[in-house]
Amino acid sequence: MTTDKPYRIQTPSGYRKYLCSGLYMPSVTTVLSATETEKAKAGLRNWQKNNPGALEAASTRGSAIHLGCENYLRGLDPGVSEEYQDFWNGITPYLDWFDTLHWSERPLRPDWNHLRSDDREVAYVWSTEHLYAGCPDLIGEIGGVKIMADFKTSNAPYSAVFPEKGDRLGFGGFRKYQKCAQQMAAYRLALAERTGYKCDVALIIVSTPETSQGIFIDTDQLDRFEAKFLKRAQQFHEMESAKDTESSSQ
């Protein structure tokens, strides 16, 4: 177990990188975004073109809900503005399920303080074996079951079931679920590598203007999503290595 403090670095391209244990590594979300299919990347670019400002608005909304969850879990006023109340309503019952909290954006137990950055208000988990890093939203227990949770806001529900042909909304929800599940599986593995604590279950808490969802992912499913993510992490590092080789030859 290392005691080196992790740091986050924003690259000129907008990708997040971390310096952890003396190694530079990408964020989990960077790996997932960079290894999307060309069709998926083109679809995102087209959506952004047709919905100017929507991506930034979604990011601001997500940050507000994340902060509300963090405040609520600490017994503080959530402080969620009226603008986002439709997304906030319905989330707290899922947060109330937890009877033990180990992490809310950063460690709540002293033996994990080596995961904090120097400013101590942020913390990360990382894998020196697979070279990636990131920040889980919530880690705790419900009746002794070790659970990692992630907060998501969306204009439409997530779906763990592959949709019927032609169901574009359902397909979007399925893709979001798949991406989030891989993200959480990656965090779970990195947390275990850094602390020895391995979550049994993951929970995606999704809030939309009309409803909220709590989607559980069991151990077997997490193991499968972990394998998928590790393939993408390997692909990412191969892509970066090829770029470095090309640059050095010019």
Each language-model region and where it sits:
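Glycine- and charge-rich intrinsically disordered segments
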Residues: M1, S241-Q250
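Compositionally biased non-globular segments, especially hydrophobic aliphatic-rich helices
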Residues: S33, T37, F236, T245-S248
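Metal-dependent nuclease catalytic cores that hydrolyze phosphodiester bonds in DNA/RNA
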Residues: M1-A133
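Amphipathic alpha-helical interaction segments
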Residues: R74, V80, D96, T195-G196, ...
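Mg2+/Mn2+-dependent nuclease catalytic core
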Residues: R106-S241
